[in-house]
Each structure stands twice: as C-alpha cells, then as structure tokens.
Amino acid sequence: MSRVRLEGIVIGGEDPEEGNAPPAASPEEIGALRERAASALEAGLVFIEAHGEELTRLRVRTLLGAETRETCAAEIEAYQADNGSFPLLGLARGGAPGLAAARVAGLAPEVLGTLEALVALSDLGLHHHPCIDGAAVFLQSIQADDGTWGASGGPPESRLFATGMLAGLLGRTRVVRPELLEAAGEYLGSIFNPEKISGRQWESLTAFGVFFTNVGHDLADSALQWIGRELERGYRTRAYDAGLTVRTLLHCQSLAVPGASLDPALLLIDLLAEQATDGGFAEFSEGNDATRVEPTLDAMLGTILLSRAL
C-alpha cells in the first residue's frame, strides 16, 4: 500500500477576517481536532484498503492525494458503455446511503450504475468530466414521460430518490439539456411538501436537496429552507447520525444549507466519535464490513472538508 501523505490535507482556512465573529473553539482546540481528524483518516484508509473493492480503494487514495483525479476519472470512464450508461461500480454494494436502498428496490442496474458514476465524479469535484456528456444523453433517452427515472408501475414517490439525485447531479454540469431538468423539476415540484422530508426520510430530503441546490426552480428558495431546517432537526434529534448528515451536505456540495446552522467543528467532533475501533464507520448498520466501506469513505471526505472549514 502506497503511503498517503496527510500533511496539509486537513489544514483549515485562513484566520477570520477582522470584524467577523471569533471561532467557537480556541486555536489549541482546533489544532487538536485537526490532529484527531488526521488520525481518523489514517484509520479509515486502513479499513477501506482491507474491505473495499479495487475502484473504491482508488477513490479513497485519490481523495487523500495519493493518486491524481485524472487517474481515478479515467478508471471510472473505462467502465462506460457505448450508450453512455455505466454498470454497477460498487457504491451500492459498499453500503452507500440511498444507493443501497435503490438497489434493493429494483432500480435498473444501468441507471443505478450511472448514478454511482455521477456520485463518484461529484465527490472528486469532476462535475464537467467528458464522460458525463454520454451519461446525460443516456439518461435523457430513458427518462419517463413524467420526467422520472425508476421502476415503472409504482407510486410517484418510489421514483423520487433516483429522479432528484440524477437531475440534481446533472444540473451541475454544462452538458444537460434544459428539457431534461424541466421535466424532472415538474415532477419533483408537484410532489414536494414539508411532510415528504420530515422525520426519518433521509432519501427524500437528500434527493430534494440535491435537486433544488443545483437546478433553478420556482420552489427552490422556500424548499431549501425547509430542507435545511429538517436536516438540522434530524441531526440534533439523532434521527440522522453525523455520517448521514455529512453525506447530505456532500451530495449538495455545500457545508452551508439554507435554514440549517450546523457548526463545522461540532459536526466534525460528532462525526469522529462515530468511528469504530477498526477504523470504519456505520459500525451498527446491517450487513458485513464490506457494506460499511462507502459510509467510511463518506466520513473521510466529510472529515477533510469539515477540517478545512475550521
């Protein structure tokens, strides 16, 4: 295993500008938290190297700076079919929140695989990689008349997660056709209401959050306020642990969601407390160690970004 250089990975931003509110923690406390985060990344890497699939191991090494983003993206692109779709890349098998449930619910493998590819590229910050063009063409070719993706025949809500995630992730790119987003937006706007995201409804909350964060829509401002409040409420009442809360923020590509006031330092402390002694996260989830790999990768990426925000 090549050594991952963690120096600098978890260095936070510059000191607050004059006139801004002082940080809640002292410099010594922030420094100690960064050191703890670096140790957590080392332990998480060991866990993923032991239990993760080959592509997942490459992804985590890339996030830690041991491999280039171009190398990882090329490996992902190599799986792409001629029609622009992707086969299953292992995120659902690794226990990725939402994706694992979509797999069980019967989302077509080529649709789920394409969603996995978009998530993996998004985590790397590669929203404009050339292979996304083909993925967008494929997804538009199979988009249902009502603007959704997912198993046909069920209630509209059964297609919410796939539709919100796919349209939201594509909304960050430069290649998606407006009519694809408009059709998905008409569907999502027609079913959105606060009850859809309250309580333990992480998939719905996250799918709506990703879509309304990245796609212009008449409901976006008000919906994001509800989403932010429900995310914070779910986190503070422990309906969602820190890992799930962070994964929503990662999908939305933002540590600041309207309506939510989540302190990066406190969220990082809670996240690190969820790491098990074997270095992995989601210790009490169903399944074996292999299904804890993606939650561990999520927590590691969250650790990096939260540490930079200190």
Regions found by a protein language model. Name each.
Residues 1-310:
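Preference for long, amphipathic alpha-helical scaffolds in soluble/luminal domains
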